[in-house]
Amino acid sequence: MSKDSSLHPKYQMASNIPRETSFLVPKEPTRYLPFQMCQSPLVTPTRPLQSSHSVHERDLHQKDSQEPSRNSGSMPLSDKYYNKQSGPVATRKCRKERTVYSKEQKCLLQEHFHQCQNPDLEQRKALALLIGVTEYKIQTWFKNRRAKECRKSSQLPRRIGSGPHYRPTSSSGGEVPDFAASPDSVCQRHVNVSYPPEFRPSRNSPHQEFNSSLIDQPLEDMCFSKSHIISEHPRQKCRELSREPGHLSSDRSGCSNVLSSPSPAAGAESSCDIPSGLSLSPQLGPPSMTQNSESTFSMCQTPSVLSPLPELSPLSNSLDQMAIFSKIDQVCEIYQKNTRSKKQRKETEKNTVQNLMHGQDSCEITESPKGTVSLPSSAY
């Protein structure tokens, strides 16, 4: 077997490679020997040194050959990088100048925007000729104006739903509310200001606390108004009865003053219990029929002149109302009985007068001589 075959297979091809020049060999090759011996422990001590020399020389040659190539490759990269760094400064795009419109031009654009927010090409060209700019700038202005309108419309609900905002204090020292606040908060402030302190709800308590003394008075007024409406029915009855012979003066409690003609039955019936404020007038004598009719008519026309309305205190309880209503009904029944007795008494008086007159006439006719007729006496 040849010497080459005794070598390790890893270094067989390395032995065939011709040796390179000696100027590439390092000055201190001995420091790599222990490492090479550890890599190939089965190799004889004479040949491995030569093979390791050759391998090491080849590796060093490859490293040296790669270093200049890397250095040469890095130079153009650095040049390119330098060009890239210096390029943007030199070739930077200039920013477009913003077109500034005058007041007249803005007014003209605003008028056209209110008429048509998205003009077509012909309208944009016409506007560009009028204003003196390009059609592209007109298109850009309309686009920005539409975006501004959309922004305003999107911000509108947020302003309405926001809470109350306050501006700095005014010269008088009070807070000036901002009109951008929500309507609920404005209404709440209006409620707190308009109501008196007794009716203003407390912020700490969930329920509203009111003064009971202020509530009782409206309740009493309401009860009195209901009683006044209910008591109109008996009052109307009394007014209808007052058209008949008799005197009546009405007030809030219904039938108050009854002026009756003299009769024994009326005196007995009038001795019934009559509530306070309801009194019978004294009997002044038997008036005639014409006087009765005139007096009743005048009382119906002007009841306040004959009997002024008394001032009644507000009712405090519904039981008092029921008691007053029952007393009013009793007085009305008494008045109806009095009127019925008056009618009956008048009818009996008429009958008696007629009977007496017929009796006197018959007596005078019988006593008078022949050829003479005596006239009946006039009724007193």
Swiss-Prot record:
SMART domains associated with the record: HOX (SM00389)
Residue stretches of biased makeup (Polar residues): 43-53, 278-302, 351-380
Residue spans binding DNA: 94-153
The keyword Transcription regulation appears for this protein: yes
UniProt main location, coarse: nucleus
Chain intervals with Basic and acidic residues compositional bias: 54-67, 234-250
Domain of life, per lineage: Eukaryota
Keyword Transcription regulation: yes
Phenotype reported upon loss of the gene: No visible phenotype; mice are viable and fertile. Female mice lacking maternally transcribed Obox1, Obox2, Obox5, Obox7 as well as zygotically expressed Obox3 and Obox4 are infertile: embryos arrest at two-four cell stage due to impaired zygotic genome activation (ZGA).
Region (Disordered): 1-25, 43-95, 152-182, 234-303, 339-380
GO cellular component: nucleus
Family membership noted in the UniProt record: Belongs to the paired homeobox family. Obox subfamily.
PANTHER family in UniProt: HOMEOBOX PROTEIN, HOMEOTIC PROTEIN OCELLILESS
Protein name stated in the entry: Oocyte-specific homeobox protein 4
Protein species of origin: Mus musculus (Mouse)
Gene name as annotated: Obox4
